[in-house]
Each structure stands twice: as C-alpha cells, then as structure tokens.
C-alpha cells in the first residue's frame, strides 16, 4: 500500500522538476557575498609570453603537460624578495580572472571531458551555492593565486586586499564571508595577522575547511624527499611526472610553510624514521642495521644530506636544487606570523576539519632487509607512513589547532578534497551564511535536526482495512512572479492495485493544491490516502 503513495509522490516530484527545468536560477539579493580561496595546486595558472602577450594554461593541462610544466613553472627562490621566480625569463605566471575569479578555481582542466570530476575543485560548491541564490560577480567570487609562492608574500596579500575591496563594492558594500580550503586557510590567516584592520573592515565570517594550521607532517616530509605524496592520486589527471613535480616543490616557499610546526605541543610528535646500515667496530668489516628516529628539527639534517646532490636539467643546463635553507628561514618567519595572528573582534571564525581517514603523520624509509645505506639515494625509497586520524592529508590534530576563538569546530568524516562536496558541509555553510529560512532545530556541531512531533504520516487498521495517509509539500522557487497561477488550483490523482494471491487489493487517492506565487515562491501541497484490504 505504501508503494502506491510513494508512486504518487515520485510523480509529483517529476512534474515539478519538469516544470522548473527551463527557469532562470533563483537569485537572492539579500545574501552577503562569499569569497572562495583554494589551497595548494587549486588554481589554474597561465603562462604569459612577454613578447606577444599570448597566454596558455600550464596548470592544469593534458597535452604537453610535463614539458610545459618544466619549461614554464620551474622556478628559483629569491631571498631578497621572498618570491620564487620562473626560470623562463620570457614568460610570467598569472591567474585567469574570468567569472569574477571563479573560473580559476572551478574545474582545473576545463578541456577534460572523460574523468572531468577528477579535476573539480570548488565546482560542486559553486553549483550548490548558485542553487541557494548566490550570483557570480555579485555575491559569489573566487580568489586564485600562484600557489608556488609564500603565503605571506606581499604581492599576493596586496592582491587579496584588492579582491576584498572589489567584492565589497560589487555587492553593495556588504561584508564578506570568506571560505578557505586547505593551504588557503594559511594565506587568509597570514593576511589577517599582517593586515588585521583591512580584514575586519571587509570580512564578517571566515570559514576554514581542512586547513593545515600546524602543518601536514607526513605529507610534506615525503614530498620534499622524493615528491611522492604530492602526486599520489593526482598524477593520472595532472599528467606531470613525480620528478618534475619534486623539482618544482623544492623551490616553493609554500611547501616549506606546510612542514611540521616544531613548537606545537603534539599529542604524538611527528618523526622521520630511517633503517640505517652501520659498520661495526669489530675490525672485520661486519655491519648491522638500526632504526634511527629524528624529530622535526633533527630531520632537517636528513633533508640537507639527502638533497645535497639534487640537480635538474633545464634546457640543457644542469641546475643545483638542494634543500633550500633560505626558504626554510623565510618559512620560519611565516610560522611566527601564523602563530601570532589574532581574530579581529567583529569577525566570526568557523573551522571544519576532516576525520575518519588514515593520515600520514610520521614517515619511515627502508626496512631491516633493505636499509638506507646512502642518504642521497633516499629519493628512490618508497615511504612507509605511521598514520593518525585526519582527512588523508592533514592530521585532525593540526586542522583543529587554529589558535583562534572559534564559534564552532566541526569534524566531518571525509577526504581532504572530497570534503568540499560533502552534503554535511553544505548544510553547515547554509546555516552559517544565513541562507534561506533559518532552521532552529539544526545543530551544525552534531549535524542533525530535531523535529517537533508531527502527524504527517498516519497508519491504522479499521474493519479489516489498512488505511494510511501522508502529507507533503514543496516550494517552487523562481524570480519571475509572472509564472504560475493567479489563484489556487486543486487537482486529484488516483492509483489502484488489483488484488492477487501475493498482494491485497489497494487504492490510493491524492489531492494536489498549487498556491499562487508570492515573493518568488510557489507552495505546492499534497494530501494522499490509501486503503487496502488488511491481509
């Protein structure tokens, strides 16, 4: 019997979807603007030719990806400015600004057809927010940036300040809700720490998602030593080799700023472990194997020795790319900025972090049967991870340690990038962004809804009959007040099921009431009842 009611409801839902298929997206003019800030590798990057002004996408692309990546993206750090500068003197890297900045952070390779979902970044969130009533260029914006650079590079911070001002003016001088993902949270926090007055002037809420506030220890350790973890799960879509990526990252301040925070009080401090072969002092040349353990500061010596003879071939020229202590010094000052940053009194902060996935925390190279004999060969070893709870990239402990007075910190089971299209995250954002009618029964911290007692569905037995009733309603949202009826309309629907040996005879009837449209909404209500012979 209940199947008949479900059939009626599905029919009405299909009718409503058909009816709304060609309508313009609903726009809510009362929403405060949102600015989306991606993490590392989360922005499309173009190379501009200085001679003819032509632009071509170098991150992300399919054809000639590795060659163009090495030619246009490889760079060297300039300690006098804190900027990493492309090796190619004839080109410079820029971020496309189409669609109010959203193009660069939406789909990272717009040309990809098969497997397109694999290069989505903020795509699902953008689509969801447009469905809530946000409008590109008026209440929805993106801030892509050159993720090779330091999170406190003044050039990037100036661009962010300009973006905040642009969003503020474009939305009619409404205060901004900033939503950052991953390393984007470090960029926002650096800006807040260094330009607190500007941040407070333009921003009302900051929501950080999966931010590595105290670093991503296991992930970055293996990235610096051989580039492995950075391309795991990405290389088949980004078409860039492990070594090409590694040689880029070794000169990226942003990577060093993601290293383990050594002065944070970790519940279990991250370590680098090496199985080493040692020569004995017995005079006969025998050796033994020992497991060595290095804390985060001690491991810097291993990085230095391991990368001491690291070189790259650039256009026929051999370039030395050792562990860069100048970048390390710069990154140390960045961590000081992050540690001292305070939340302005008028800004609210929310923290969403990923949980329930094994996340690299400490890293081990070699084993008893195959120890590391020469540190310069460490790059050829596969790492073994000692994992903790997190999102697969950022440990939960790091993501939670924002050091700010948060309105809420909420853990969501999910993967580092996948969390951006999680329905639970969407519900939290709707709540904190004040989208739609407020739900007084929804608690984002626990992510469940407490509903008052209702009698929307009733079922009872009487005189050998089973009777069930259901009531359901929908709101059709449209910004065109001319659509729909001028008065209420009432229609009826009926479905019957003949009886047989397996199923009793049953019949369901429903009344569909469509109210006239008002303020962009049209209310539809269904009342249905079914009757069957009680078997």
Swiss-Prot record:
Name which cysteines form disulfide bonds. Answer: none
Q: Cite the SUPFAM superfamilies for this sequence.
A: alpha/beta-Hydrolases (SSF53474)
Q: What is its EC number?
A: 2.3.1.-
Q: Where is this region: Disordered?
A: 488-507
Q: Name one GO molecular function term.
A: phospholipase activity
- Positions of the catalytic residues: 182, 391, 416
Which residues in this protein are found as N-acetylserine? 2
Keyword terms: Acetylation, Acyltransferase, Transferase
Biological-process GO terms, alphabetical: phospholipid catabolic process
Q: Where does this protein have compositionally biased stretches of type Polar residues?
A: 488-505
Listed under GO cellular component are: cytosol
Query: InterPro entries annotated for this entry?
Result: AB_hydrolase_fold, LACT/PDAT_acylTrfase
Q: Which family does it belong to?
A: Belongs to the AB hydrolase superfamily. Lipase family.
**Entry protein name:** Lecithin-cholesterol acyltransferase-like 4
Organism, as annotated: Arabidopsis thaliana (Mouse-ear cress)
């Amino acid at each position: 019997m209940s199947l008949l009611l479900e059939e009626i409801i599905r029919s009405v839902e299909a009718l409503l979807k058909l009816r709304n298929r060609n309508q313009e997206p609903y726009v809510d003019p009362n929403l405060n603007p949102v600015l989306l800030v991606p993490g590392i590798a989360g922005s499309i990057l173009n190379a501009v030719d200085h001679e003819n002004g032509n632009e071509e996408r170098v991150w992300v692309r399919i054809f000639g990806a590795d060659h163009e990546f090495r030619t246009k993206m490889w760079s060297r750090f300039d300690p006098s400015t804190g900027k990493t500068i492309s090796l190619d003197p004839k080109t410079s890297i820029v971020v496309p600004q189409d669609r109010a900045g959203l193009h660069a952070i939406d789909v990272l390779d717009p040309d990809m057809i098969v497997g397109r979902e694999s290069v989505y970044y903020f795509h699902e969130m953008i689509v969801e927010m447009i469905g809530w009533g946000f409008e590109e260029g008026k209440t929805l914006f993106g801030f892509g940036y050159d993720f090779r650079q330091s999170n406190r590079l003044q050039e990037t911070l100036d661009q962010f300040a300009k973006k905040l001002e642009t969003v503020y003016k474009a939305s009619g001088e409404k205060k901004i809700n900033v939503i950052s993902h991953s390393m984007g949270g470090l960029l926002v926090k650096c800006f807040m720490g260094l330009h607190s007055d500007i941040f407070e002037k333009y921003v009302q809420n900051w929501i950080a998602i999966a931010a590595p506030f105290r670093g991503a220890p296991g992930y970055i350790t293996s990235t610096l030593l051989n580039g492995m973890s950075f391309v795991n799960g990405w290389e088949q879509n980004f078409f860039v080799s492990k070594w090409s990526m590694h040689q880029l990252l070794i000169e990226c301040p942003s990577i060093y700023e993601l290293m383990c925070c050594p002065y944070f009080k970790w519940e279990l401090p991250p370590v680098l472990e090496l199985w080493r072969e040692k020569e004995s002092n017995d005079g006969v040349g025998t050796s033994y194997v020992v497991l060595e353990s290095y804390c985060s500061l001690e491991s810097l010596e291993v990085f230095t020795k391991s990368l001491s003879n690291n070189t790259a071939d650039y256009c026929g020229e051999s370039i030395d790319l050792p562990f860069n202590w100048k970048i390390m010094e710069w990154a140390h000052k960045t961590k000081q900025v992050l540690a001292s940053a305070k939340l302005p009194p008028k800004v609210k902060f929310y923290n969403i972090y990923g949980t329930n996935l094994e996340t690299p925390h400490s890293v081990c190279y070699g084993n008893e049967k195959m120890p590391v004999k020469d540190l310069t060969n460490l790059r050829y070893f596969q790492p073994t991870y000692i994992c903790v709870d997190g999102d697969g990239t950022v440990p939960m402990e790091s993501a939670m340690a924002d050091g700010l007075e948060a309105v809420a910190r909420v853990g969501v089971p999910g993967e580092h990038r996948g969390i951006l299209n999680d329905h639970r995250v969407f519900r939290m954002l709707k709540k904190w962004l004040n989208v739609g009618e407020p739900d007084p029964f929804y608690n984002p911290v626990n992510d469940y809804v407490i509903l008052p007692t209702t009698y929307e569905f009733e079922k009872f037995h009487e005189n050998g009959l089973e009777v069930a009733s259901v009531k359901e309603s929908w709101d059709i949202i449209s910004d065109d007040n001319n659509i729909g009826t001028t008065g209420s309309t009432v229609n009826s629907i009926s479905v019957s099921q003949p009886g047989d040996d397996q199923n009793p005879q049953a019949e369901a009837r429903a009344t569909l009431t469509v109210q006239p449209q008002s303020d962009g909404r049209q209310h539809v209500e269904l009342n249905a009842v079914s009757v069957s012979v009680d078997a």
